[in-house]
Design a protein with these regions (language model features):
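N-terminal targeting leaders
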Residues: 2-185
Length: 185
């Protein structure tokens, strides 16, 4: 089963790389990660999701999101208790390729459909503002929004990161900004 998943992920990633199509909203050729790191991040996300689904009831696993950027794994979503939160982090840290786990899971009930729609709107607003600003490499920033909290991931220069963070802080609907950038200068 794991081999089948690996082949499927690799096939999709390879097809995307050949045409430089968009993946997760960003063209692969505009990413500061290498093609290998990009594929590795997709594999990490699949492995994390599978570990959650193999361990927790489907209702719990479906409320845990895994986002990997340059082998740093961000966990967001809602879990029913602290023990589940800790177990999810342990499972994520057990993925060999992962360098760092950012456990941003909250102990609460699942968010509403309206909250999810609001998060999508906030993400769109953030990405639009980042892409409009010519001093920020908006295509190189991964944006994740959960319950109004915006998480920023990417490989940026410090000045780019400072500007991007300020843009996001001043975007409608953003309640908090969590900066997870890695600096390249």
């Amino acid at each position: 089963m794991n081999k089948l998943i690996y082949v499927a992920v690799f096939g999709v990633a390879l097809a995307q790389l050949q045409g430089c199509t968009t993946a997760g909203g960003e063209p692969v050729n505009l990413d500061r990660r290498s093609a290998g790191a990009y594929i590795g991040d997709q594999e990490i996300e699949v492995r994390a999701k599978n570990r959650m689904r193999d361990t927790f009831p489907i209702k719990v696993a479906n409320n845990i999101s895994s986002t990997s950027y340059n082998r740093q794994l961000l966990l967001t979503g809602q879990v029913p208790d602290q023990a589940t939160r800790a177990k999810a982090e342990e499972l994520a840290k057990g993925i060999l390729e992962v360098r760092t786990v950012f456990n941003e899971l909250t102990v609460s009930g699942a968010t509403s459909l309206a909250s999810g729609a609001n998060d999508a709107t906030v993400t769109t607003g953030v990405k639009t503002r980042l892409l409009r600003d010519k001093t920020v490499p908006g295509t190189k920033i991964k944006v994740v929004t959960e319950n109004g909290v915006v998480y920023l991931m990417g490989l940026l220069k410090r000045a780019e990161a400072d500007t991007a963070t300020e843009i996001v802080r001043n975007t409608a609907g953003v309640t908090k900004v969590v900066v997870l950038f890695e600096f390249i200068d």
